[in-house]
Amino acid sequence: QAKVDGIRALGAEVRIVGRSQDDAQVEASRLVREEGFCEIPPFDHPDVIAGQGTIGLELLEARPDIATILIPLSGGGLAAGVALAARTIKPDIRMIGVSMDRGAAMHESLAAGRPVEVEEVESLADSLGGGIGLANAHSFALCRDNLDATVLLTEDEIRLGMQALYFEDRLVTEGAAAVGAAALLAGKV
């Protein structure tokens, strides 16, 4: 709710449509088609994936010795971009997507071998929730081809990751930003 309130405070009109990201996408597509809105896709678009890939390039430029990258995993744009860029430079690098243990759409889709719908749930890592779109055109295949594994975290593990980042490094993060540290602290990587 804090994110929605912040968006409204900036003057935007917020419309909550349906019960899932997939429901909202149907409405967004209608608005583009019927009312001339401009859509900026959150993850499943080549330009978005390419932009996210610059993170992988910067990581390897700064630390060419990195053997493994942990990537927050949601709709797959970030994971696809970082993994593809990093693998282009360093083909043997290990790429691990990290998500919450409930409502992890990309993880469930990878396990099923195709995009699937999942129930969206409240989470400390809520920005990792939401569907990937049943007609996913880019991020699913790139994640399938470039992630070595996915790791799922409980709410307690995410909370402990957030706390560790705050108390040890003085970083205030949302849950999704803490999943890499949380996976390490939980011994899942």
Describe the predicted segments one by one.
Residues Q1-V189:
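PLP-dependent amino-acid enzyme catalytic core
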